[in-house]
Regions:
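Conserved PLP-enzyme active-site core in the AAT-like
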Residues: 2-321, 326-342, 350-358
Length: 360
């Protein structure tokens, strides 16, 4: 089949718009051919368990799944009794971008708090972590954070540890939505375990689709006492792949070989972050030099996303050539996301287009 899409089309709507990294495609091809046992009893999934233990510690156990919503819902279900609830930021993906799946599929009550930067703090968790033992209130038993957040901000290991300590002191657990965990790791310049298992996270989702995989994520259990029934929940939630070797092969490609200094997850995420930083710095310079007016940034640029407000009509005109999303139409806030395959030329051309629209 010949390509149906324009190979030159570029955009900043989402890292989900990007293609598949060539090293991931090679890993899929390498795993192809012959027969392997289905449903995760293959050699690739067995090796994946070892590699996740290498990255997160000997206690880690990984469950490959199809997508991020499935990873979050299934992981959280495994952490909660039927009367349990999750405390999250209002901007959290589980609250605002999963179509009600946690509630409808998982039967999970989400208790939200408002956070200006998408990050939770112990003080914010306190707003919902109450009513323990009250049969009239869903019991807040899990705190869920996103790393990096939906607003492009990144938790430090110390911030994660503070939330984990608070949760554990109250008999709660800490869950991490790691759809962009690679971008957080690249931003922090730290091993994955430094802000996950070493910081007290109990269960996380390890994202790959936004970082160059074809599809697939993994639920990673870091404290086995915090989770139960995942083997069965993955099946009942329709997240059990029969040909799991092709999910596991992609994750193996992302995590790299033993001793590899810069595995694919890090190289891809570091590049995406660098392109977001390039976009931010070029626009900062244009504002400072007085070449453009009307643009204001709304969040720090710490990972691979840039948030800004634009004057009325500008976003629609820019979208004639570059796809991106409105984040808050009422205020003119937009989101620009960079990917592993965003080039410097892409950034420079987009910056030039913005400068033409906002020329002083």
């Amino acid at each position: 089949m010949s390509a149906l899409h324009d190979p030159d089309l570029r955009g900043f709507a989402s890292d989900n718009y990007s293609g598949v990294h060539e090293e991931v495609l090679a890993a899929i091809a390498a795993a192809n051919g012959a027969h392997q046992v289905a449903y995760g009893e293959d050699v690739y999934t067995e090796e994946l368990q070892r590699v996740f233990r290498r990255e997160f510690g000997e206690q880690a156990e990984a469950f490959p799944v199809f997508n991020g919503t499935g990873a979050n819902v299934t992981g959280l279900q495994s952490m909660l009794p039927r009367w349990g609830a999750v405390v999250s930021a209002g901007t959290a993906h589980i609250n605002s971008d999963e179509g009600g799946a946690p509630e409808k599929v998982g039967g999970i009550k989400i208790l939200t708090v408002e956070s200006p930067d998408g990050k939770l703090t112990p003080a914010l968790v306190d707003e919902q972590a109450w009513g323990f033992g009250d049969e009239h209130r869903a019991q807040p038993l899990v705190v869920s954070i996103t790393q990096s957040t939906e607003l492009g901000t990144v938790y430090t290991p110390e911030e994660v540890r503070a939330l984990a300590d608070q949760a554990h002191e109250r008999g709660m657990r800490l869950h991490m939505d790691g759809a962009r965990i690679a971008n957080a790791g690249a931003a922090l310049g730290l091993p994955l375990r430094a802000f996950t298992s070493d910081a007290g996270v109990d269960v996380l989702s390890f994202g790959g689709t936004k970082n160059g995989m074809l599809l697939g994520e993994a639920i990673v259990v870091l404290d086995r006492e915090a989770s139960s029934g995942l083997t069965f929940l993955r099946k009942t939630n329709m997240q059990l792949s029969s040909k799991m070797r092709f999910l596991s092969a992609q994750l193996l490609a992302m995590l790299g070989e033993d001793g590899e200094a810069e595995p694919l997850w890090l190289r891809s995420a570091r590049h995406a972050n660098a392109m977001a930083a390039r976009l931010r710095s070029q626009l900062d310079e244009a504002v400072a030099a007085g070449r453009i007016t009307g643009l204001a940034f709304t969040q720090p640029t710490q990972a691979n996303a840039v948030f800004a407000t634009l004057p009325a009509g500008v976003a629609d005109r820019l979208r004639a050539a570059y796809r991106f999303y409105d984040w808050n139409p009422a205020t003119g806030e937009v989101r620009w996301v960079c990917s592993f395959d965003t080039s410097e030329d892409d950034i420079d051309a987009f910056t030039a287009a913005i400068e033409r629209e906002l020329a002083a």
